[in-house]
Amino acid sequence: MKNLIIALLITFKGYSQQLNRTNDGYTEVVEVELSKKEIHQKLNEWVAVNYKSANSVVQLNTEDKLIVKGNFALSLSVTKYTFPYRINNTLTFSIRDNKYKIDLAPTGISSEGKSLSSLSLINRFIKSKLLSKEEYLVLNDETARKSFASMGYSEKKIEKSMKTLSRYNKTDYEDYLKNKANWDNAINSTFKSIKDYLNKSKTEEDW
């Protein structure tokens, strides 16, 4: 597990995007040798290439702003099992001459086509640093209690549920480390895909 923690720390430091001011998403300003019009065109091309139906995901498309609502796949581990999720998110592109800003904000989570009631499952991943085991367990405890309370559980039932939950959480921190790595890679891949597409030279596009 020590090697996994070290790898995560090294990987996270290599990311260009940062948490936004409200700590609920990611942001990055990218400088390019392109006009505002060229940036706008390439961003629209990227959306068309990466989404099944660009028309259904684009919420706003003006010369200086492009807003896209979509989702990406994310696998999360729980003990020895891995479950597929879809992370709904809003991508906002702000455009100027020679630079653009990417804002990515997760807005929801679903599993097998069903929306989950809360973002608490992934909020633990939107952090500027890797949580220590102690920090994670405190956050996990708070999240679980809030979840049970939102389901109308009494204090007595919450305590009973917490005891039951603790018996199944022996690998919880290790799961967090794996899931955090998957999360960070998914976010980083999205930003990298956008930047790589806009950095394509005209020579690469010639045919």
Which role does the model predict for each range below?
Residues 1-21, 194:
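Bacterial Sec-dependent N-terminal signal peptides
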Residues 17-207:
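Ser/Thr-rich, low-complexity intrinsically disordered terminal regions
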